[in-house]
């Protein structure tokens, strides 16, 4: 049985769903961010989620047990290899998962795709994701933003998570913000970044607002036109 989101009525689909990729190293908070996004946006949008793990479906289990979405709206994918391959070089396993999910939920507004934990070079194929969010955590070290890599420099939104841990690991949030600003400034301006503490929901509203704005979404009864779609 496919679980509807009953509070969303009379929806008129205009476009395919927005596909939002969430990447980052192991333990950075990708699954927790996805949980918070689902809980914060499910009253306005029809959501489904795809999670990636190498050998298990642990993230699918965690999302299901947290009540982020009904169980049948969360699909776990076992990549069985290097995580970035399944989101970049050969995204077919995830593209197939999206197709299968949309057969069951054709009115979905947003498909979240969470990658398996990977390094700073991981990026989503444009065939798989319309928007990319890359998550790091403060505990990994103050130096991470200035190391660069596609996740830091090219993602549509860069998230620096676990800001509450900064005093305990000797990290300066001001330094991390300055380094991030330098690494994400292009000829077109500064690409956005957000600092979050998901334990207190700090920064979550900013992430949701970014998805709505950049993804050209509108709460209510209909999806609207989006850039390039």
Curated annotation (Swiss-Prot):
Protein residues bound to GTP: 24-31
Main subcellular location: cytoplasm
Gene3D superfamilies in the cross-refs: P-loop containing nucleotide triphosphate hydrolases (3.40.50.300)
Keywords attached to this entry: Chaperone, Cytoplasm, GTP-binding, Nickel insertion, Nucleotide-binding
Coiled coil residues, start to end: none
A Gene Ontology term for the protein's cellular component: cytoplasm
InterPro entries cross-referenced by the UniProt entry: CobW/HypB/UreG_nucleotide-bd, P-loop_NTPase, UreG
Cysteines joined through disulfide linkages: none
UniProt keyword annotation of 4Fe-4S present: no
Keyword match NAD: no
GO MF annotation list: GTP binding; GTPase activity; nickel cation binding
Biological process, per Gene Ontology: urea catabolic process
Matches recorded under Pfam families: cobW
Protein localization: Cytoplasm
PANTHER family assigned to the protein according to its UniProt record, in alphabetical order: UREASE ACCESSORY PROTEIN G
Function: Facilitates the functional incorporation of the urease nickel metallocenter. This process requires GTP hydrolysis, probably effectuated by UreG.
Subunit note: Homodimer. UreD, UreF and UreG form a complex that acts as a GTP-hydrolysis-dependent molecular chaperone, activating the urease apoprotein by helping to assemble the nickel containing metallocenter of UreC. The UreE protein probably delivers the nickel.
Annotated family: Belongs to the SIMIBI class G3E GTPase family. UreG subfamily.
Entries under NCBIfam families matching the protein: ureG (TIGR00101)
Protein name per UniProt: Urease accessory protein UreG
Gene, per the UniProt record: ureG
């Amino acid at each position: 049985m496919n679980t509807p989101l009953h509070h969303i009525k009379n929806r008129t689909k205009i476009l395919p769903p927005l596909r939002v990729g969430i990447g980052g190293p192991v333990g950075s908070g990708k699954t927790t961010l996805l949980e918070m996004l689902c809980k914060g946006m499910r009253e306005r949008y029809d959501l489904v989620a795809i999670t990636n793990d190498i050998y298990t479906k642990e993230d699918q289990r965690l999302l299901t047990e947290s009540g982020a979405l009904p169980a049948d709206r969360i699909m776990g994918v076992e990549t069985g290899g290097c995580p970035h391959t399944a989101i970049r070089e050969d995204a077919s396993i995830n593209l197939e998962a999206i197709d299968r999910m949309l057969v069951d939920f054709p009115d979905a507004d947003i498909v979240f795709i969470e990658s398996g934990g990977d390094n700073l070079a991981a990026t989503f194929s444009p065939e798989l994701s319309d928007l990319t969010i890359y998550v790091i955590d403060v505990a990994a070290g103050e130096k991470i933003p200035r190391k660069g890599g596609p996740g830091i420099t090219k993602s549509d939104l860069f998230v620096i998570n676990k800001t509450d841990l900064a005093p305990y690991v000797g990290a300066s949030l001001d330094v991390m913000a300055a380094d991030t600003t330098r690494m994400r400034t292009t000829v077109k301006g500064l690409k956005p970044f957000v600092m979050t503490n998901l334990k207190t929901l700090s920064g979550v509203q900013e992430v949701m607002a970014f998805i709505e704005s950049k993804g050209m979404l509108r709460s209510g009864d209909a999806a609207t036109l989006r850039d390039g779609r």
